Design a protein with these regions (language model features):
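Basic, polyanion-binding surface patches
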Residues: 1-169
């Protein structure tokens, strides 16, 4: 029944460090607070990312575009750090956390884990955003530039982008 809420924006969750670094695709993410800036992401306990977020107490949310679709697919269908060699991404130093950011992403939000709760078959990790970086052209005038083809997951292996048209009321 959760598919009734789709399409949903798709994100990449980076966790771990060094040889344990991992990237996972996630749709179940939401903003929880503006001040302080907090976001939450639901991760199943069987995911390698789950283990790393608990171990390191931090994670990075990266915002992919259509140009990163193959990497998004790999991150969502393969498990463990070995998948990074199949991906065409660059892990770059973050400013406030040890977990890396993704150089090709149009935005990276560096989070410190502040809470976690189990809801059914997922753990909801709450992160306080300590720092963020973004491509200024992709977020002009403090809103997304839809020409950057932000990804939304439709279901299974189907993704969509947003029409390059804003409807005003």
């Amino acid at each position: 029944m959760y598919r009734l809420l789709y399409p949903m924006r798709t994100f990449l969750v980076v966790s771990g460090n060094g040889e344990e670094a991992d990237v996972m695709t996630a749709d179940w993410l939401t903003v929880l607070s503006n001040k302080p800036f907090m976001i939450g992401v639901a991760v199943a306990p069987k995911r390698y990312t789950h283990k790393l977020i608990k171990k390191y107490g931090e994670f990075v949310i990266s915002v992919p575009t259509l140009e990163m679709l193959k990497d998004v697919w790999i991150a969502g269908t393969k498990s463990g750090p070995s998948k990074l060699k199949d991906m065409n991404i660059t892990l770059v130093d973050s400013k406030k956390v040890a977990t890396k950011s993704i150089g090709e992403a149009v935005a990276n939000l560096e989070c410190k884990l502040v809470d976690e709760q189990i809801y059914g078959d997922h753990t909801f990790f709450v992160g306080e955003v300590l720092h963020y970086t973004y491509n200024e052209a992709a977020f002009r005038d403090n809103k997304p530039n839809l020409k950057y083809n932000f990804l939304a997951h439709v279901g299974l292996n189907e993704f969509a982008t947003f029409e390059d048209k804003i409807h005003e009321m």
